[in-house]
Structures are given as C-alpha cells and as structure tokens.
Amino acid sequence: MTRVIKIEKNGGPEVLQIKNVQLPELPPDQVLIETKAIGLNYIDTYHRSGSYPVPLPSGIGVEASGIIKKIGSKIKNLSVGDNVAYGGLPIGSYADERIYPADKLVKLPDGITFEIAASIMTKGLTVFYLLYKTFPVKSHDTVLFHAAAGGVGQIFCQWAKSLGCKVIGTVGSDEKVTIAKKNGCDLVVNYSKENFVEKVMNFTKGMGVPVVY
C-alpha cells in the first residue's frame, strides 16, 4: 500500500483526500518511483477545481523527483537506485510511490537535488519549448515576456539572457520588479502603473520586438 492524494469531486483544497491504495503490477515499460520531492504547479489547482477537467476520481500533480525502486522487464537504460525526475502526464505526482513510464523520466546528474529537480521540470520544459520551438530566438534578439516574476518567467529570463537576448519583462507590482531584475531582465515594466507598449517602443527605439511570450 502507498499513500496518494486523490480528488473524487472538483472544488477547493478541501476536496483533496489522502488515500491508501494498492499499486497495480508493474508494466514492463514502466518503473516504480519512491517520491522524494513534489513540484507544485498552478495547473494542479485547475485540475482540482475542474477548470481543466480530468476523469474522476483522479490523482493530482504533474511533477516530482525520486528514486527508482523497481524497473519493468523491458527497461534497459535505467536501474534500481537511479535518481530521476519527471514533469507532465499522467497526473498523480502527489504520492509516496507511483508507477511511471520510463521513457518520460530524466535521470538526474550529480549535484542536482531532488528539490531543485522537482521545482523546475515542468517550468523548465515550458521555457525550452518557448525558446527553441515556439519562436527560436537568436543572440541579440530583444524579447518580451509577460509575468516575468513567476516560476516560468524567472527561468525564462535567465535562459534567454544566457543565449544573448535582451529581455523585457512585465510584472504587476513593485515587489515583482525586483524579482524580475534579479533574474536578468534588462527592462522591467510594472503594468499596473506604466504602459508597457510605450516602454517597449522607447527601449527598442521604435523597432518593437520579434516575439512576445
């Protein structure tokens, strides 16, 4: 038996229930993971509330890290004892142990803690997709990122700067201005006080930006 957090109906935090469940037999292409850290994401609240409907009853959570306790018979590239992390479906990371597809796991390099891994997988993969797939940036591009002080925004600002970009970020408070600057924004606009379009055009000398995230 293992403990998991389940929802049987949609609602607020009160619908989260700790359940003891029996895990099924391990499929040949999956592994059993002992959870060490869980990433909390805003999408978890959407699944819980029903804003993003999921079949009920359901587990919750899309991101975690841990240690492999058992491997399926077809697994060749992972071993018992490996430290791994994941970010994405299937839902159910709020659990002491869980079974998860091996091909969706990332083996953790030395020096990356469980806590760091569980906090950046989903957000980091989102930033990778934005910078390399949605609009592949080039060095010296000036880019605009809304919500620059959020979890995704902080990673985005650091990553884009490492690629040689100039980063303009928008935030909603003075406190968040400080956070965005700390993470590399060249210009931070508090949209509750300032017109970000005017600020962007002034900063770019009327050229604008090739992409807005």
Segments from the language model and where they lie:
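Mid-domain Rossmann-like dinucleotide-binding core that forms the NAD(H)/NADP(H) cofactor-binding site
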Residues: 121-194, 198-199
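N-terminal glycine-rich beta->alpha transition that marks the start or flank
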Residues: 12-13, 21-65
